[in-house]
Amino acid sequence: MIIELIRADITSLKIDAIVNPRPTGGDVGTATVSSGGNVLCKFVITAVVPRAGEESEERKLRDAIFAALHRAEELAISSVAFPAFAGAAARVVLRAALDFRAHARSLQRVVFCAFNEEMHREFGRVLQELEAS
């Protein structure tokens, strides 16, 4: 499974599914699937993420990323895109994606979309650090 970082509008990607992280809409750490609607992807995976400062925030965020990636596997799709997360969350979501590699079967490509150059650089730096460790 390849992990990529790009600077783009996530809704413009030709990808099987995009992940919509939300702090509401179910139990934190879970994920649901709906159709792609008016975007180019086939599916939207909504991952329920913790609110900033919530108890056990890092573990819950990791659980939400894993849940979204497991949903992608259940759909037997090959690609999924996440919006890039800012700050300390970047390390958590990238570590979760790297750790998920051992579980990937159909999923071949995970893309993180940064919306600005600063976030793109920060995510790239964190990804390099994690891949080197």
Locate each region found by the language model.
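Phosphate/ribose-phosphate-bearing ligand recognition and processing surfaces
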Residues: 51-133
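Glycine-/small-residue-enriched capping loops at alpha/beta junctions
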Residues: 1-75
